[in-house]
Amino acid sequence: MTCQAFASSDNFVPLNSDSSPSLPLIMHHSAAECLPVSNHATSVVSTVPSVLSLIQTPKCSHLHFAMMTSGNVSAGLHYSVPSCHYGNQTSTYGVMTGIKPATPEMLSASLSQSRILQTCSMPHPNVVNGVSTLQSKSFSFSCSLTPCLYKFPEHALSASSCALGHSFTPMHQTLLSDDPTAADFKQEFRRKSKSVEEPVDMDSPEIRELEKFANEFKLRRIKLGYTQTNVGEALAAVHGSEFSQTTICRFENSQLSFKNACKLKSILSKWLEEAEQVGALYNEKVGVNERKRKRRTTISIAAKEALERHFGEQSKPSSQEIMRMAEGLNLEKEVVRVWFCNRRQREKRVKTSLHQNAFSSIIKEHHECR
């Protein structure tokens, strides 16, 4: 690989690579305008005078790369490079375009590679001696040297060797900070959630009251004759399907959270009051029915024989006769009256059966005679 010189006054600085032979970088500058480049293109200038010389209006600079293989000169790669700004002055760096014009395919390839390499480029700090002095004089130093866009044989490109440093103005801190209103809202939300999630003391009066109510509720529920399933179905019919037998069981065993137990306590206490009122009304109705219905009276054998004798004499005694018999047998008048009624019904059934038997026997004899 060789370098073609354009003039005797031209100066060149080799652009070295770790994995490839050196590629000459030919720049048309005077001695004061020479821009040395390191092997990875990470340094811009090494002295302040050379930087100050860049502020002046430089001559048009060109780069030219050529390769020599087997004694023949290959076609040179020529393309233009975007300009680099130094303050208010402009200086154009690029490959020499006077020998051969760049083809459209080469330009499109260079543009696509430049976009890829620009995204992969790494920021480089200012390494120029005395840059702080220039910055204090309000000089804006922002330079981007266009990298080698074509991959030569045995020449590997890297992000560090194809990009120079960039100087960007840092974003103001107020733009990066969050909205104060949103921050206050977040702090308020965290404070409320923290207060809700704080654990409850197990020895607090609220916990003891919940445990006491759970035990009382269980005893009163059993006394009323309701099961946990009955309570869950009754509550689900009114408040929705969130109540079930499992919920009632966990409440009675104090296995619910403090918040859910407090919510369920008010609902169960109201249901318990209504259930006790319904139970009281039911007991009153049952008591009235029990008073109307008397228990069965047992009559001794001697009393039954005396009543049979009176029934043989008079099957339908009067009220006075029933009273005298009740006083003589030490029975209630209503008991004697009911006994005579039952005895007459039984006598009637016996006579009916006798008549039916007699009639059936007569019919049978009649059929036999035929």
From Swiss-Prot:
<keyword id="KW-0804">Transcription</keyword>
<dbReference type="GO" id="GO:0000978">
    <property type="term" value="F:RNA polymerase II cis-regulatory region sequence-specific DNA binding"/>
</dbReference>
<comment type="similarity">
    <text>Belongs to the POU transcription factor family. Class-1 subfamily.</text>
</comment>
<dbReference type="GO" id="GO:0045944">
    <property type="term" value="P:positive regulation of transcription by RNA polymerase II"/>
</dbReference>
<dbReference type="GO" id="GO:0005634">
    <property type="term" value="C:nucleus"/>
</dbReference>
<dbReference type="Pfam" id="PF00157">
    <property type="entry name" value="Pou"/>
</dbReference>
<feature type="DNA-binding region" description="Homeobox">
    <location>
        <begin position="292"/>
        <end position="351"/>
    </location>
</feature>
<dbReference type="InterPro" id="IPR009057">
    <property type="entry name" value="Homeodomain-like_sf"/>
</dbReference>
<keyword id="KW-0010">Activator</keyword>
<comment type="function">
    <text>Transcription factor that activates growth hormone and prolactin genes. Specifically binds to the consensus sequence 5'-TAAAT-3'.</text>
</comment>
<keyword id="KW-0371">Homeobox</keyword>
<dbReference type="InterPro" id="IPR013847">
    <property type="entry name" value="POU"/>
</dbReference>
<keyword id="KW-0238">DNA-binding</keyword>
<dbReference type="InterPro" id="IPR050255">
    <property type="entry name" value="POU_domain_TF"/>
</dbReference>
<dbReference type="InterPro" id="IPR010982">
    <property type="entry name" value="Lambda_DNA-bd_dom_sf"/>
</dbReference>
<feature type="domain" description="POU-specific">
    <location>
        <begin position="202"/>
        <end position="276"/>
    </location>
</feature>
<keyword id="KW-0539">Nucleus</keyword>
<dbReference type="GO" id="GO:0000981">
    <property type="term" value="F:DNA-binding transcription factor activity, RNA polymerase II-specific"/>
</dbReference>
<protein>
    <recommendedName>
        <fullName>Pituitary-specific positive transcription factor 1</fullName>
    </recommendedName>
</protein>
<dbReference type="InterPro" id="IPR001356">
    <property type="entry name" value="HD"/>
</dbReference>
<dbReference type="InterPro" id="IPR000327">
    <property type="entry name" value="POU_dom"/>
</dbReference>
<dbReference type="Pfam" id="PF00046">
    <property type="entry name" value="Homeodomain"/>
</dbReference>
<keyword id="KW-0805">Transcription regulation</keyword>
<dbReference type="InterPro" id="IPR017970">
    <property type="entry name" value="Homeobox_CS"/>
</dbReference>
<feature type="short sequence motif" description="9aaTAD">
    <location>
        <begin position="5"/>
        <end position="13"/>
    </location>
</feature>
